[in-house]
Amino acid sequence: VTRVIGFGILALAAAMAPGQTTAQEESAVVVPSGMPVIFYDSLWDSASSTERFRFLAPRIGGDMPMDFAAVSPDMQHLCDSFALPRLGGRDKLPALIVISLMAEPVAFGDPAPGIPQYFEAYSPKGGICAWEAF
């Protein structure tokens, strides 16, 4: 599994460069629901030809979490407008794109039962993400 990090510890960088945007702010992604979503990382699994894009979405957790039905359109949007454009330069597209939202950072593969996580799978077809039963 190959990992690309999009989120990191930014306090020192922010303190050293006041008035400049941080990498975290630059990785914020606008979604239809309007909830704050930040690109966290992507993981390539060559064995299954799957690219996973993971996003931090704090509002799916907490006291009044957004449910799966409310954020499902966001996941489609993230696949179509965030994931696919980042795969465009490859000779071969992955067979499957998995979009995941997590309320807090979670190590890949960790079930973390106390942290809400939502997942959807898509196949890249004709320039769009086609939903796949997961």
Language model regions located:
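Generic marker of residues within folded, mature protein domains
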Residues: 13, 43-45, 69, 89
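N-proximal, solvent-exposed amphipathic alpha-helical segments enriched in charged/polar residues
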Residues: 19-51, 59-61, 133
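Polar/charged, Gly/Pro-rich intrinsically disordered segments
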Residues: 92-134
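Mature extracytoplasmic domains of secretory-pathway proteins
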Residues: 54-98
